[in-house]
């Protein structure tokens, strides 16, 4: 059973590791920059990052390895690929190497790194041989809710999108949502600004949207139809 850790506790853990990263690369909190998850995993945590085809249907995005083990992936043509992984390996599906997958790739690396952070800090509570992350956040591959996966997702989000960095990006982008209402439309300049924020931070639209909702910058779900869209295209 994974140790109970609140969102606030996970945020505090992330903050300490971000401080290590900033100190290592000479970054100041007064002029914050997003962490590069590959550099973070390698330089701060001492992890070995590999990119390999993990499955034929994309349901496995990444693996976290705590002890020597073998893994068999079945490719689209039916070929079976057997790999031997070592402790402190994190393996990302090579399909995420594409530029269009930057946000998903970065979050997956941060997610797998988060598993190692938790295993390092709480060795009696974490550290299964192989941990797989599926498409559905906060759930195991078999669809059952997983407390450990929620913690890894939350810690990953705190590493990539700490509050101080998001606030700096909000100021940089001149984002203004007085009522917390966002239209997912090019007619809303805030939507474009948030997309630019996501690109600078290196996360997906979904990730930055959820983070802004958690910070209560956005209230509720984005509305798909902007009033100007109705004027332009009709109801």
Give the predicted meaning of each segment:
Residues 1-235:
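Active-site hotspot residues in diverse enzymes, especially metal/ion-binding acidic/histidine motifs
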């Amino acid at each position: 059973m994974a140790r109970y850790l609140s969102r606030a506790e996970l945020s505090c853990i992330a903050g300490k590791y971000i401080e290590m990263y900033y100190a290592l690369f000479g970054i100041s909190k007064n002029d914050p920059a997003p962490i590069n998850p590959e550099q973070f995993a390698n330089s701060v945590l001492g992890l070995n990052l590999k990119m390999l085809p993990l499955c034929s249907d994309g349901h496995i995005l990444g693996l976290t390895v705590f002890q020597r083990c073998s893994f068999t992936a079945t490719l689209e043509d039916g070929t079976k690929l057997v790999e031997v992984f070592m402790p402190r390996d994190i393996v990302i599906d090579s399909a995420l190497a594409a530029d269009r997958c930057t946000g998903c790739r970065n979050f997956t690396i941060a997610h797998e790194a988060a598993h190692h952070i938790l295993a390092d800090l709480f060795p009696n509570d974490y550290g299964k041989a192989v941990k797989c992350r599926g498409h559905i956040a906060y759930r195991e591959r078999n669809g059952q809710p997983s407390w450990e996966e929620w913690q890894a997702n939350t810690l990953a989000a705190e590493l990539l999108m700490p509050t101080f960095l998001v606030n700096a990006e909000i100021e940089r982008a001149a984002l203004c949502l007085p009522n917390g209402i966002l239209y997912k439309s090019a007619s809303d300049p805030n939507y474009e600004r948030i997309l630019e924020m996501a690109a600078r931070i290196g996360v997906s639209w979904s990730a930055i949207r959820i983070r802004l909702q958690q910070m209560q910058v956005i209230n509720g779900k984005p509305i798909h139809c902007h009033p100007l869209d109705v004027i332009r295209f009709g109801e």
